[in-house]
Amino acid sequence: MLENLATTLADTLEGIPVLSLLIIIPLIGALAAFFLGKNNAKLAKSIALAFSFVALVLSALVLIAYYGSGNGGFMFSENYVWVEQLGINYNIAIDGLSLPMVFLSTLLVFLATLFSWDVSEKTRTYMSLMLVLEVGVLGVFMSLDYFLFYIFWEIVLIPMFFLISIWGGPNKSYASIKFLIYTHVASL
């Protein structure tokens, strides 16, 4: 019965750009938390938690559909030409290696958002950065194009720098600069 449910779910999700939705949902949440939570920290937290939960549920559905289908290769593939002259495509998919990382990333962002409920300094910025970080991490794990991978990798570095430099520990300034230097040098 569970196998039939997974197969039905896989068939249902196959025609939907589910992986793009996994990237877009946290991005919309980040924008909503930042702009709608301007004067209300609790609203910003609630928006971030809701959007991270939706991404978690969607990744769980993809996980069930993938492993229930018995497919061992790429699934839910999306490929759109982006810059044809340079051979750059928006090409994303998941496989048995990337899917657990996608699911764990959505789970960790949801839990991090939930357990950082007591953040009181620049709350809307913090919650927005968490969701932008989720966008970048999910893109890194789902990218099949090197240029797209690099873009998502750089997207991860920006919110991480600000999260460390604003909400970090006692040596947050030193740590954030070191993080920025090492990760940017490594990304070249």
Question: What feature does the model see in each segment?
Answer:
Residues 30-35, 60, 110-114, 135-139, ...:
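Alpha-helical transmembrane segments of multipass membrane proteins
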Residues 1-18, 36-114, 121-128:
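Transmembrane helix-loop-helix hairpins at membrane boundaries of multipass inner-membrane proteins
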Residues 21-38:
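N-terminal signal-anchor/start-transfer transmembrane helix
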Residues 21, 25, 50, 100, ...:
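Alpha-helical transmembrane segments of multi-pass inner-membrane proteins
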Residues 24, 48, 106-109, 134, ...:
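Small-residue faces within membrane-embedded alpha-helices
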Residues 24-28, 54, 152-159:
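Membrane-embedded alpha-helical segments of multi-pass membrane proteins
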Residues 23, 92-93, 106, 142, ...:
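Short conserved micro-motifs on helix faces and helix-strand junctions that flank
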Residues 39-41, 125, 129-132, 136-188:
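Alpha-helical multi-pass transmembrane bundles of energy-transducing inner-membrane proteins
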